[in-house]
Amino acid sequence: MNSKLKFIYEGKAKKIFAYEDSDKVIIEFKDDATAFNALKKAKFEGKGELNCLISSKIFEFLIKNNIPTHYIGLKNNNSMIAQKIKIIPLEVVLRNTAYGSLCKQTTIKPGTVLESPLIDFYLKNDTLNDPLLTKDRINLLKIVDEEELDFISNMTLKINKLLKKFFYNIKLDLVDFKLEFGYNSNGQIVLGDEISPDNCRLWDLNQKNGMIVSLDKDRFRNDLGGFIEAYSEINKRINNFI
């Protein structure tokens, strides 16, 4: 990084640097993999680069389809330029198929295709383990107002339609994914963070025996092996498609 950049934040998977006198930031993707709120950690060479490249291509696809995002462009293979945004402390999870926490909290069997997409909201707070929120609790905490929450929900549904088709074209089933949003310098709500196998649950549609083959962070989370190979496969399929 050069002298015009100032370090402002480091999270589990990314570092953020701000340009002086600008509303732009550099997001540098790290090689760290974490699970269970960082109770499980490891480093995988090349992970940051893969997540950055995958995210950049998906952001470009979404922007072409009129989704407002913070993404501006690539700086290099493991860093992107983005708008500086004020993150809304909500994690927005959309589920197309039941898996993970939904099955632990309900009687729905894993792998059940939902009749319609389900949106869950979680408070973005590691100390509290990102608790599930109701709309009334979101209102109580004054995280966003009702109109903004409707906007976020509608945008999430639109993103889901686009991503389901995008991933289906590269033989991947989009099971669920997590989004984050924020306010840009104009006060507009835009999609932030990243879209990668770190925050999307993706199952390989090339399997013909009915087995679930994850090509996402579940390979690290559940000790399945082939973690970097799965991310590399997704990047390869995207490159072959676009």
From Swiss-Prot:
Cystine bridges: none
Annotated SUPFAM superfamilies: SAICAR synthase-like
Top-level division of the source organism's lineage: Bacteria
Protein's pathway: Purine metabolism; IMP biosynthesis via de novo pathway; 5-amino-1-(5-phospho-D-ribosyl)imidazole-4-carboxamide from 5-amino-1-(5-phospho-D-ribosyl)imidazole-4-carboxylate: step 1/2
Molecular function terms, GO-annotated: ATP binding; phosphoribosylaminoimidazolesuccinocarboxamide synthase activity
EC category name: ligase
Pfam families: SAICAR_synt
EC number: 6.3.2.6
Keywords, sorted A to Z: ATP-binding, Ligase, Nucleotide-binding, Purine biosynthesis
Catalytic activities: 5-amino-1-(5-phospho-D-ribosyl)imidazole-4-carboxylate + L-aspartate + ATP = (2S)-2-[5-amino-1-(5-phospho-beta-D-ribosyl)imidazole-4-carboxamido]succinate + ADP + phosphate + 2 H(+)
GO terms for biological process, alphabetical: 'de novo' IMP biosynthetic process; cobalamin biosynthetic process
Family the entry assigns: Belongs to the SAICAR synthetase family.
NCBIfam families: purC
Stated name of the protein: Phosphoribosylaminoimidazole-succinocarboxamide synthase
